[in-house]
UniProtKB/Swiss-Prot annotation:
GO terms for biological process: segmentation. It is found in: Nucleus. Keywords: Developmental protein, DNA-binding, Gap protein, Metal-binding, Nucleus, Repeat, Zinc, Zinc-finger. This is Protein hunchback. The keyword Chaperone does not apply. Residues 16-56, 63-82, 156-196 are annotated as: Disordered. GO terms for cellular component: nucleus. Residues 17-29 have a biased composition (Basic residues). Gap class segmentation protein that controls development of head structures. Residues 177-196 have a biased composition (Basic and acidic residues). Its main location: nucleus. The gene is hb. GO terms for molecular function: DNA binding; zinc ion binding. Belongs to the hunchback C2H2-type zinc-finger protein family.
Length: 196
């Protein structure tokens, strides 16, 4: 559900943006010709500057809205599927981290699936990650930067701190068993510090 909503939102945004733009343009044209035809030439300067400013206002509001939406998406991305996103984004990007992150991830599926709702299972989230890559590069770049930062943090703090809501159960489950993976992880992120 989450990933499909996410993909739908992302796909709709550019379309609705274009549509909105055209729509505003049309109404502004119609308004222009109407005002010129029906109103006296005296008044036509008033309505004709009016629609553009109105359009600009609409567009500004819409852009602000879009920015907020994108920020929300970023927050959602970073809060909810952070761990899946971590695995998805780190595995292709950092060859040095490849095996380590895979090993670390393979140690986690059970606790993750227990804690995450069904829609947060690796496969849908992976699709959400790919949609993000395709549709809005900025968000993904920001997420990747955040991931790098998180990776550096993981050298100092265990990954559970990234997702507070899941931390208690996860820290018990994952720390009890795949501690080797955590050591690998912190080593590799220290390597990354020197690489980056």
């Amino acid at each position: 559900w989450y990933s499909s909503m996410f993909a739908a939102n992302i796909k709709q945004e550019p379309i609705s943006h274009h549509h909105h733009h055209h729509h505003a343009h049309h109404s502004h044209h119609a308004h222009d010709s109407n005002s010129n035809a029906s109103n006296s030439p005296h008044q036509s300067p008033l309505p004709s500057p009016n629609p553009p400013s109105h359009t600009n206002l609409q567009l500004e509001q819409y852009l602000k809205q879009q920015q907020q939406q994108q920020q929300q998406h970023q927050h959602q991305q970073q809060q909810q599927p952070m761990d899946t996103l971590c695995a998805a984004a780190m595995t292709p990007s950092f060859s040095n981290n490849d095996q380590n992150s895979r090993g670390w991830w393979s140690g986690l599926p059970n606790p993750m699936q227990t804690i995450m709702p069904a829609n947060m299972r690796p496969s849908p989230t992976a699709t959400a990650a790919t949609t993000a890559t395709d549709c809005c590069a900025p968000t993904t770049t920001a997420a990747a930067i955040a991931l790098q930062a998180n990776d550096k943090l993981q050298a100092l703090t265990p990954p559970m701190d990234v997702t507070p809501p899941k931390s208690p159960a996860k820290s018990q489950q994952s720390c009890a068993e795949p501690e080797k993976e955590h050591d690998l992880m912190s080593n590799s992120s220290e390597d990354m510090k020197y690489m980056a």
